[in-house]
């Protein structure tokens, strides 16, 4: 079983979330957000055999400059609209893919404060349980 966290602000058409098994929705207040002060964060469950298709489905709908997390017990996928990085959770920020995801994020205009994937992933992983 895989899990995912998606901010619907990141999607061109957020109705795509309706095709997923939703385990939880959290509304976060982000007063400094340039997009929206309120973000709807969806926590999803995905069957292991569907993970690649579901990542691709979300990536196609994702706006530029956003990313989503998909994970199981071993790996964390950091998915952007045009590229996905597979990170070993045991190594996290020491994993080459983690560093490449940060570099890629910078190249598409994401601010460094949002590229601390470890911080955000651990927070969302805890909320999803």
What are these regions (language model features)?
Residues 14-16, 52-54, 115:
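Short acidic, gly/pro-rich beta-turn/loop elements at beta-sheet edges
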Residues 10-15, 56-58, 105:
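Short, mixed-charge, low-aromatic patches
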Residues 20-91:
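Short, intrinsically disordered low-complexity segments
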